[in-house]
Amino acid sequence: MTPHSARPWPYPRWVAHRGAGTLAPENTLAAFRKGAEHGYRMFECDAKLSADDVVFLMHDATLHRTTNGHGIGGDLNWQHLSQLDAGSWHSRNFSGEPLPTLANVAQFCIRNRYFLNIEIKPTPGIEYKTGEVVAREAAHIWQHEAVPPLLTSFQVESLKGAFKTAPHLPRGLLLNSLSEGWLDTAKALECCAVVCLYALWTPETVKAVHDAGMKCLSYTVNDEWAAEHLLQLGTDGIITDRVDVFSPAA
């Protein structure tokens, strides 16, 4: 099996954060459609498990910020979660927008030949299991597709679960700081990318990642000066909320 770091990089440079940043309710199909309207072909989303192991999209552990529900999303069965309103918090135009499953989003992406970055966002306490289940489902859904989704996580245990379950799927280590051993961790997980808070990239860190055969991605880049700096550094991917500002053709 060819190591991921040695394979060609198939993904676009520009990635729409949570579908379309703040232009639509995050992590919904409405957001993906909005991002696509602005020309984006790759999307980032957050995936976690319901109590009955359905993979669905949501960033927070709790429901109250982005739905009309309450409590911890991972404590509820999908039948309950599927009835929630995930759009009204954003604006009246999106009232009634449901939480999507990973399968819903995958269907949209595959049908339109879009690319997906799935951030594994586990409910605390089930990091490894979430990585396993997300990877297993992604491997099944994309088994006949030329380009699989990129699986990323801040949680090393989630990436370990994904690695064990579907080692052929590409992985990226998410970082909000460069603690000791960060690059060795990415290597041990056989990652193809390191996804950093954009301010962490320097000529030295970019070179270290590239020399290790991995790509450098950045989150969440919403200012033009930051995007220009990252392009000058030679980074490989930019995750942004501002799909209305940055042209994905740039």
Where are these regions (language model features)?
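Phosphate-group recognition and catalysis centered on beta-loop-alpha active-site segments
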Residues: 1-250
